[in-house]
From Swiss-Prot:
It catalyses: alpha-D-glucose 6-phosphate = beta-D-fructose 6-phosphate. Keywords: Cytoplasm, Gluconeogenesis, Glycolysis, Isomerase. It is found in: Cytoplasm. GO terms for cellular component: cytosol. The lineage of its organism: Bacteria, Pseudomonadati, Pseudomonadota, Gammaproteobacteria, Vibrionales. InterPro entries: G6P_Isomerase, G6P_Isomerase_C, Phosphoglucose_isomerase_CS, SIS_dom_sf, SIS_PGI_1, SIS_PGI_2. Belongs to the GPI family. NCBIfam families: PRK00179.1 (NF001211). Pathway: Carbohydrate biosynthesis; gluconeogenesis; Carbohydrate degradation; glycolysis; D-glyceraldehyde 3-phosphate and glycerone phosphate from D-glucose: step 2/4. It is an enzyme of class 5 (isomerase). GO terms for biological process: gluconeogenesis; glucose 6-phosphate metabolic process; glycolytic process. This is Glucose-6-phosphate isomerase. SUPFAM superfamilies: SIS domain. The active site is at residues 356, 387, 515.
């Protein structure tokens, strides 16, 4: 099990607090001037295809050593072993945490409750492979004998965000099948998705472990109604619906052949489930072989994370740097900025991955924490973000550490587009780190013929303080394997921070209260009677809603 160690009570935390008295005045320009080898010392590679440059951070070798000491004193290495060995580190749900087993390409035994889970994992993968090949090849036919052309994945949260993100990221590897994702219980989402589709050539994947998730099952029933309005016969449902679930009884009652039910296990958390049967939509989108490459890429990082000393461990380094800003510099958010349009949902995916995992205010002892835990995660692709929110990152009053991610090789070599994209990628981290001093601004104004009076009016607005920290992650090319690398890298970063913060990263009780209250409110919306059972605000809103729609 994970130890219950309050990080703020360790000697390392005290040392970092003392170190911060000096470190808060670090200047990146000075750090680079003082050390010509800074890039070499503060960058690392993962395999042949990924470079991680963390040299533009407000850290020195001393800072990093103190951070590594914090990891040691909170027994991070022991926690890593506990996760990989199948210990029930998700204590509040009494579960192991083994998304790593789903991509365990070495096939070494992984024991849960005395049983090796790998035979079951491999059996589901084989079933996914056969199903995928039948659909992609056109062997699988709909109820009128036509090939399936469109797949609609109906899920929410981890059953949607991960598959959608990966399918978009790997669009260059697309099969002949067209993928669609429906998540929101807002009827608009499914109505607009189904408008251009033909029931004869559409297959639905219903992704719900329990087959009871409100949003997913509401959309699933609407999809079935849409299908039957054309197909007529309930028996035809079996050829157009498959389930990613463990509830065979409910799946069968829905009309789905349980031979087309793909199971996963309670040791797979929703936000880590794209590696499981939930990833069936990915396999259909890009082909099963590419899905396996995705698993391979993640497994490479798993091996690195489990077997590499902390000082050279990429997820550990990224996690500790993030913690340095979160807990000592007082930053409240991190931005993920992929300079690759295919990665346009990457930040949103890790918004869930990070904020649902580490958005906790109670430690593993059950006590309220008195230190900061999970940061706010957000971001958009470059260069779009440059014309939206980079202003605040450059000249605002908040410190926002940023991760810049870009491929050296584009899937779309159109003119000089990629060179222009990458010139912006390189320029932004340089600008954020080093800024533009007043004397430079004045020199530019002078060269442009500005008078002293004109300069006095504008100089202050043109100065960039710099000293904004960034990581740069340069990928040779976004492939299934390198995407698997990246995803696993961020997953393990989240785990490391949760261990050090002494919180449980694999439950999500914070999502429950709103669902409970929604279930209580739902029957109150069935008629036009005035409601007075809630607080005055909620009563007022419900009654206004009823009045508006009357």
């Amino acid at each position: 099990m994970l130890k219950n160690i309050n990080p703020t009570e360790t000697q390392a935390w005290a040392d970092l607090t003392a170190h911060f008295e000096t470190a808060q005045n670090f200047n990146l320009a000075d750090l680079f001037s003082a050390d010509a080898q800074r890039f070499d010392k503060f960058s690392t590679t993962f395999g042949q295809d990924i470079l991680v440059d963390f040299s533009k951070n407000l850290v020195t070798e001393e800072t990093m050593q103190k951070l590594f000491s914090l990891a040691e004193q909170t027994e991070l290495s022991e926690a890593i072993k506990a996760m990989f060995s199948g210990e029930k580190i998700n204590k509040t749900e009494d579960r192991s945490v083994l998304h790593t087993a789903l991509r365990n390409r070495s096939n070494t035994p992984v024991i849960v409750d005395g049983e090796d889970v790998m035979p079951a994992v491999n059996a589901v993968l084989e079933k996914m492979k056969a199903f995928t090949e039948r659909l992609i090849s056109g062997e699988w036919k709909g109820y009128t004998g036509k090939e399936i052309t469109d797949i609609v994945n109906i899920g929410i949260g981890g059953s949607d965000l991960g598959p959608y993100m990966v399918s978009e990221a790997l669009a260059p590897y697309k099969t002949r099948l067209n993928m669609h994702f429906v998540s929101n219980v807002d009827g608009t989402h499914i109505v607009e998705t189904l408008k251009p589709l033909n029931p004869e050539t559409t297959l639905f994947l219903i992704a719900s472990k329990t087959f009871t998730t409100q949003e997913t099952m509401t959309n699933a029933h609407s999809a079935r109604d849409w299908f039957l309005a054309e197909a007529g016969d309930q028996a035809h449902v079996a050829k157009h619906f498959a389930a990613l679930s463990t509830n065979a009884e409910s799946v069968s009652e829905f009309g789905i052949d349980t031979d087309n039910m793909f199971e996963f296990w309670d040791w797979v958390g929703g936000r880590y489930s794209l590696w499981s049967a939930i990833g069936l939509s990915i396999a259909l989108a890009v082909g099963f072989d590419n899905f396996v490459e995705l698993l391979e890429g993640a497994h490479e990082v798993d091996n690195h994370f489990a077997n590499t000393e902390l000082e050279n461990n990429v997820p550990v380094i990224l996690a500790l740097i993030g913690l340095w800003y979160n807990n000592f510099h007082g930053s409240e958010s991190e931005s993920i900025l992929p300079y690759d349009q295919y990665l346009h949902r990457f930040a949103a995916y890790f918004q869930q991955g990070n904020m649902e995992s580490n958005g906790k205010c109670v430690d593993r002892n059950g006590n309220p924490v008195d230190y900061q835990t999970g940061p706010i995660i957000w971001g958009e692709p470059g260069t779009n973000g440059q014309h939206a929110f980079y202003q605040l990152i450059h000249q605002g009053t908040k410190l926002i550490p940023c991760d810049f991610i870009a491929p050296a090789i584009s899937h779309n070599q159109v003119g000089d587009h990629h060179q222009k994209l990458m010139s912006n990628f390189f320029a932004q981290t340089e600008a954020l780190a080093f800024g533009k001093k007043e004397e430079t601004v004045r020199a530019e104004f002078a060269a442009a013929g500005k008078t002293e009076a004109e300069m006095a009016e504008l100089v202050a607005f043109k100065v960039f303080e710099g000293n904004r920290p960034t990581n740069s992650i340069l990928v040779k090319k976004v492939t299934p394997k390198t995407l698997g690398n990246l995803i696993a890298m961020y997953e393990h970063k989240i785990f490391v921070q949760g261990v050090i913060w002494n919180i449980f990263s694999f439950d999500q009780w914070g999502v429950e209260l709103g669902k409970q209250l929604a279930n209580q409110i739902l029957p109150e919306l069935a008629d036009d009677k005035a409601i007075n059972s809630h607080d005055s605000s909620t009563n007022g809103l419900i009654n206004a809603f009823k009045a508006f729609k009357a």
